[in-house]
Curated annotation (Swiss-Prot):
Belongs to the ThiC family. It comes from Burkholderia cenocepacia (strain ATCC BAA-245 / DSM 16553 / LMG 16656 / NCTC 13227 / J2315 / CF5610) (Burkholderia cepacia (strain J2315)). Keywords: 4Fe-4S, Iron, Iron-sulfur, Lyase, Metal-binding, S-adenosyl-L-methionine, Thiamine biosynthesis, Zinc. Zn(2+) binds at residues 446, 510. It is an enzyme of class 4 (lyase). The keyword S-adenosyl-L-methionine applies. Coiled coil: none annotated. The keyword Iron-sulfur applies. This is Phosphomethylpyrimidine synthase. One of its GO terms (cellular component) is cytosol. Binds 1 [4Fe-4S] cluster per subunit. The cluster is coordinated with 3 cysteines and an exchangeable S-adenosyl-L-methionine. The lineage of its organism: Bacteria, Pseudomonadati, Pseudomonadota, Betaproteobacteria, Burkholderiales.
Amino acid sequence: MNANPKFLSADAHVDAAAVAPLPNSRKVYVTGSQPDIRVPMREITQADTPTGFGGEKNPPIYVYDTSGPYTDPDAKIDIRAGLPALRQRWIEARGDTEVLPGLSSQYGLERAADPATAELRFPGLHRNPRRAQAGKNVTQMHYARQGIITPEMEYIAIRENQRRAEYIESLKSSGPNGAKLAAMMGRQHPGQAFGAAAFGANALAEITPEFVRDEVARGRAIIPANINHPESEPMIIGRNFLVKINANIGNSAVTSSIGEEVDKMTWAIRWGGDTVMDLSTGKHIHETREWIIRNSPVPIGTVPIYQALEKVNGKAEDLTWEIFRDTLIEQAEQGVDYFTIHAGVRLQYVPLTANRMTGIVSRGGSIMAKWCLAHHKESFLYEHFEEICEIMKAYDVSFSLGDGLRPGSIYDANDEAQLGELKTLGELTQIAWKHDVQVMIEGPGHVPMQLIKENMDLQLDWCKEAPFYTLGPLTTDIAPGYDHITSGIGAAMIGWFGTAMLCYVTPKEHLGLPNKDDVKEGIITYKLAAHAADLAKGHPGAQVRDNALSKARFEFRWEDQFNIGLDPDKAREFHDETLPKDSAKVAHFCSMCGPHFCSMKITQDVREFAAQQGVSETEALKKGMEVKAVEFVKTGAEIYHRQ
């Protein structure tokens, strides 16, 4: 049930389904100011509009791509070797880090020397860990506050813009109606941004490297980018950028293997996971994490207290600061990009959970609550927070300050324990920022819709606009097996109100460890929620993809409808259940309404009639009604006719 040595030592390979390009898509790269800034995007090719609808060219659209080299046919994928270290030269060029002679963590050294783990170890890493030079700070926030625009920031600006300006220009040159087409396809509704950057309805508003730098310097955005994870493609989490989503993976003591977790990671990023958290709690946590990081183009997060607990055989009361500190260094030297640390679970808050319906539901929160009660002392995470900051800034690990007292039921939403912890997280944010350490704040949980905005508003106030990262929230507790939907509702709302990253929930939430199918279902649901939030905020260019799909739908370009959507495979499968023949891919109807009741076909018939008569569509409808009225009188003015 746990790690399979034979698989890892001899047969480790990437799942073929994760490396095939999506239909009608290809990986393209946009080059920045230097040749090694090559920003990946997915180009989706579209068919020409049928002659009957104008016959214009439909240029490709570009969408944000998290899949890394896996969907690039030109890339050589070997998970035993790992991904290329694309940020290595940038890190070295800054001249503020040093390569260590070996591992610093005692546990890391023990694992490296243990012959029992030899067959499980990742074989492809041939470099020692890196750390800041003495007295140096290597965080992206530190650089931003020094006025430095790093290659990572330039990369992010290009990535966030998704070639919108080029797309609009390609529409203008698509034919005689190009200018009209560009105006139509570039149109978007003004959003309501709730205090975030107001871009209005300007689809061409540009995200600049300077804007990225300024947001990071202010603490309103983070770039999770450990110097020991040079394989990662820079991305940003902040409410003035595209809403991001996280996918949780990880083994447990009773199920899954290292190979399965690597597969889940590559599967999650294929469908749009912006970051991945490895929440492994079973055997071989260290080795599992190494395989995942070395093969991940997206930031990896962890909850270090989980592994620390394994080191004391699951006895929370036996945890010590020294064990936890060693775990932080171990994981930082592997390349973990952000740590969830439940430093806000203070002794004084634990009694406040006594009258809850569901108590403390966070694993990390319950571990720290148990430790506090066993020792009747303040949490060592809280007491040693400044020392944790010193470790974080030596590797550029970002804080994800954990909501250990989040509500686990609607009943417990917005209670004193939850909000007390949130206030403490705001205080800890200020301490981290004093060290130029990047911070995001974790949020609930289970919250009914009418209380969601209060959560967002309090977080913005108490945490001084540090990015919010929420699990849903789930808006009702009555749907086990459908909690990706109960939470997707809350996720779309809180994303609109200002949350920067949404942690996905799968259909297995509360029921079991998700498999690959569950991971995909959760990812697609949350991509949908995040995109809905971007639309509602009026984020630049958010509506481009919607407009392209709507145009394809109206023109019955079925393949384009499938391919522009979030899940081409499912869309095609559903269509083909009832209309499987190739001829149905060009038909002007689907099985919902059939050939005679398709509203879009009827609209097109009206337009065609208008063109033939040389009148406007409104006049055509009026003229058509007059013709039908004459026919009605001629047939006897009877509503019903006997057959």
